[in-house]
């Protein structure tokens, strides 16, 4: 892994300004946010089914968000992109390559057992589609595959505070939850870690004002992140995924269905030129 975040492709190319998506022509901002939560949950469930480490799952989630920050949902079916991101992340994070059979079986099982209310049909893709989708994902990211996460700085901060046993479990869960937002595309990981730690301190009623005051960090940025986290929890508690997702998915702009045979088509059945959308 690259040793310096500030010189890494993560910082130089993938800390993005927030932009409206083309998909907001079809979906409200709230519906788009719910779609992002849904597919983050799919990636999480798939990673857990495959017994992947949380960092692998987090990296897969970042890949997914990077792709759809630059391309419409219409370009490649997110149901295909989700396992593709897991497949690539498992290799990049040196977990080991997930076998073709295991990946397809796990995706089919997770969609059928955990998300049948939103995806009643069989998983329509095979490994050749995932491998082709991986090519487009790599092309978009220009092979910039190293992802920095808030977990390591969070651990260092909590140890520095001397509150590891009290604060780390809650702050870690909050970091996991931030992947259901776009924070990983908008802010450096150390800032996300500090924001999650701040929320954990408030919840656990730990006075850390002096510790935060001594940091050389833009606290306005930290407060921006905290507001996003609090908004996530406020909206999340009112989100009935089982009731709402089928309708939202039906409004999502759709790519063409997968081809019946291999050829010069992309993984969603469209010609390669359809991947030039921005």
From Swiss-Prot:
Name the principal localization, coarsely classed. nucleus
User: According to the UniProt entry, which residues carry Phosphoserine?
Assistant: 270
For this UniProt record, the keywords arranged alphabetically read as follows:
Activator, Cyclin, Nucleus, Phosphoprotein, Repressor, Transcription, Transcription regulation
**Statement: the UniProt record of this protein carries the keyword Phosphoprotein:** yes
For region Disordered, the annotated ranges are 247-278
| A Gene Ontology cellular-component term | nucleus
Bias-annotated ranges (Polar residues):
267-278
What residue stretches are annotated with the Cyclin N-terminal domain? 41-139
Q: Name one GO biological process term.
A: G0 to G1 transition
Q: Which SUPFAM superfamilies match?
A: Cyclin-like (SSF47954)
Q: Does the keyword Amino-acid biosynthesis apply?
A: no
Pfam families assigned: Cyclin_C_2 (PF16899), Cyclin_N (PF00134)
Give the record's family classification: Belongs to the cyclin family. Cyclin C subfamily.
Question: What is the purpose of this protein?
Answer: Component of the Mediator complex, a coactivator involved in regulated gene transcription of nearly all RNA polymerase II-dependent genes. Mediator functions as a bridge to convey information from gene-specific regulatory proteins to the basal RNA polymerase II transcription machinery. Mediator is recruited to promoters by direct interactions with regulatory proteins and serves as a scaffold for the assembly of a functional preinitiation complex with RNA polymerase II and the general transcription factors.
How it assembles, according to the record, is: Component of the Mediator complex, which is composed of MED1, MED4, MED6, MED7, MED8, MED9, MED10, MED11, MED12, MED13, MED13L, MED14, MED15, MED16, MED17, MED18, MED19, MED20, MED21, MED22, MED23, MED24, MED25, MED26, MED27, MED29, MED30, MED31, CCNC, CDK8 and CDC2L6/CDK11. The MED12, MED13, CCNC and CDK8 subunits form a distinct module termed the CDK8 module. Mediator containing the CDK8 module is less active than Mediator lacking this module in supporting transcriptional activation.
Record-given protein name? Cyclin-C
Provide the gene name from the record: Ccnc
